[in-house]
Amino acid sequence: MLEIKVEGSRRNKKFVEAILPSIVTQLKLDTCKKALLIRLYDECNDNEGTTLDLSAVTGAYLVVIKPKRKLKEIALALAHEMVHVKQMAKGILKSAKNGDHMWAGKRYSKDTAYLSRPWEIEAFSKQELILRRAIEE
């Protein structure tokens, strides 16, 4: 079972903890044997969020999301980053040397345009539906 810890302000933490079970279920991460740390702190440079696969070292995935005033923005970023957790858990998305990534066995340079990366295309295509389902439950 996926062990989850959420860090951030009380408001943001409570919100994320409320919608996260639905997101985990939708992405079929319930049986993942790794840990997940979600940090709602301003630690992700220009991105709204970032996901790191630290499972080889710590047994965990790290999701960092910029805290926003609007909860919907946090929720969209969370849904997006959780798609990346799913991609990593299934072994479809892997980090490679020098900031490159492997997607389904194909290497993509760190210079690949953000919106041309297949893992980003998939995450953007799913985030809204995941969020809507999570809010409805």
Give the positions of each predicted feature:
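Soluble non-cytosolic domains of exported or imported proteins
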Residues: 10, 14, 72-73, 77, ...
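Active-site scaffold of zinc-dependent metalloenzymes
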Residues: 41-73
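Post-HEXXH active-site segment of zinc metalloproteases
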Residues: 72, 88-121
